[in-house]
Regions:
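Transmembrane helix-bundle segments that form internal channels/tunnels in multi-pass membrane proteins
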Residues: 1-42
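Extracytosolic and intramembrane catalytic regions of membrane-associated proteins
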Residues: 40-164
Length: 164
């Protein structure tokens, strides 16, 4: 005998799908070694700022974003400009995001960018949201999300958790 209870599974599934779709996507991501970062551009897709060769992190970010591209896809560099001391790109709201490779890039990038990633120690007077050596060595990989007036961080190794 069929009862109205059979519809409860559909209700739960619909709720789970709605909850998953409502989960906000991060605006920027940085790998646990601080050498590879990604940002969400104007088209809503991830673009990659590469200093390192961490294709594993890129593959995982793309999979989590339901993006069929591979880490070697040329379109991951769309909107990214690089030189010898770093790379820059634009977030969806047109603010700059950068990854610093050479210390000489800090002065300009800290003054112009909203977010600066680096695997180096950064200067104390940087005006940007920084994810530098001190951050990723303490917390591992970092995701940043713009909440309207500031970035919120989600880290892989929060201090509130005792992990081996």
């Amino acid at each position: 005998m069929r009862t109205p209870l059979r519809w409860s599974g559909a209700f739960v599934a619909t709720g789970a799908i709605a909850w998953a779709l409502a989960t906000p996507q991060p605006d920027t991501l940085v790998a646990g070694d601080g050498q590879t970062a990604a940002f969400r551009g104007k088209d809503g897709r991830l673009a990659v700022l590469r200093a390192g060769r961490d294709t594993f992190a890129i593959k995982e970010w793309l999979a989590a974003d339901a993006d069929a591209r591979t880490p070697k896809d040329g379109s991951l560099g769309n909107g990214v400009t690089c030189d010898a001391v770093g790379c820059i790109g634009r977030l969806a709201d047109s603010r700059l995001v950068s990854i610093v490779v050479g210390i000489e890039a800090f002065a300009e990038d800290c003054a112009r960018a909203a977010v600066v990633f680096s695997d180096r120690e950064s200067p104390a007077d940087c005006n940007a949201m920084l994810v530098d050596r001190a951050i990723w060595q303490s917390y591992g990989a970092v995701a940043l999300q713009w909440t309207g007036d500031r970035f919120t961080q989600t880290v892989a190794l929060p201090r509130s958790q005792d992990r081996p």
